[in-house]
Amino acid sequence: MIRISRALAVATAASLALAACSTGGTTAGTGATGAASVKPSSAAAVKGDGTLTIGTVLPQTGNLAYLGPPEFAGVDLALKEINDAGGVLGKPVAKIDTDSGDTTTNIASQSVDKLLGQKADAIIGAASSSVSESILDKITRAGVVQFSPANTSDKFTTINDQGLYFRTAPPDKLQGRVLGDLVVSDGNDTVGILAMQDSYGSGLADQVTTTAEEAGATVVERVDYDPKAAEFSADVAKIKAKNPKAIVLIGFEETAKVVQELVKQGLTADKVKWYMVDGNMSNSNYLKMPKSTLKGVKGTIPGAAAPEAFQKRLLTVNPKLTNYTYAAESYDATTLIALAAEAAKDDSGTALAPKLIEVSKGGEKCQDFKSCVDLLKAGKDIDYDGVSGPVDFNDAGDPSVATIGVYQYDKDNKYDAAKALEYRKGNIAG
C-alpha cells in the first residue's frame, strides 16, 4: 500500500492538530489515512509559537541503552552549532530530553505525553523500530514530526504517518541485502537464522533470506523467537539440528543469552560463522564473556564512517563517548529539522514536514547548518548533504541512498566502532 500524497497527509494532520488545540492546550515548556479532503486553510491555521522545540525519545534505559549516548551526543552537537549560528527563526532552539525505554515498558508513551504537553514541534526517536511504531500515531496525530535516526524496519516505508515520519537510517531492505551478500560471499551455502520476533527482526530476516537464496545459498532453518524468553535452548537446538555453515543473529541485548546457548551447544564462532546486525553489535554486551568468544564474528551497521573531525566534535559534548553508532544520523536529523523550519518560516510540525524533503535534495549543496541557512536566507534552494551521507529523502520519508558498514569482532569481544572493515553503498529501491 503506497502512502497518500504527503502534502494531503500533512494537511490532514494539521486539521487534526487544530481540532485538538481547540479543546484547550498547555503552556509551552523549555529545555490508514483516508480522511475527507482538507481545506488548505486548515493547515495554514496551525502555526508555530516562534520557538522551535525539539524533543528526544531516545534510549536511556532498556535493551538499546548502549545506543543512547551517541544519539544524544549527535543531537546535542547539532543544537550547539545551530544555536551558535543564531538559532532558528532568530531564536535559540529549545530541547527536551526523555527516555524511550524499550518494548517491555510504557516509558516511551509517557515520554511522548510529556513532550506533547510541552509543545514539542518535532520529536527525535525512538531508536527501536517497535518502540517508534508504538508511539507514532500519538505523535503524528498531534501534528508533530517524528524523526528517527535509527529505525530500520521496512514497515515505516508504507505506514500511516500523516506525512510526518522521517528517518536518516535506511530501511532494512538495504542492510538485509548487504548482510545476505556478505554471508554468501564468505563461502556459506547453508544458513541458519535466529531472529527476534518483531517488525525489526522479522523484516530483516525476510530480506536476508531472500538475498541469500537468490545468491544460491539455502536457509536451512529460521527461528523467530520471543526476545523476552528466559532462555533459548530449544531455539538454538532447532538451528543445530540443521547443521548450517553460518548463523545470522538478529536481535538486541538478549543476543548475549543466545550466544551463551550457541557456545553451550557447541556452535562456537570458530566452528560456525556468526553474523550480527545493528541491533546487537555492541562493545559492552559481551565483555564478560571468555576472550575470543566473538573473535571473527562479522556484523552490519547502517551508516558511513563518522569522520575523525566529527568524532572530535562529538567529544566536546560528551568526552566519555566511545561508541559513535547513529551519532551522525542523529546530528543530521536535528540539522534537517532546523533547516526545514527555516525554509518554512514556521516552527510547527505540519509546516516544516514538507520542507524536510525540499532541503534534503535538488538545490545548492551545503554541509552544515550555518552555510545552509545562509543560502536559504539568500533565497536559494538547498541540498543538505550530512555527516551520515547524502540524505535525499524520497516521498516516503526514507533516504534514497545509504551506506552499510561491515564490522568484525576481535579476541576481546569488541569491534572498532570508528572504522568498518568495508563500507557498501546502495540505492534503497535497488
Q: Across the structure, where does each feature detected by a protein language model lie?
A:
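Extracytosolic ligand-binding ectodomains
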Residues: 1-18, 22-430
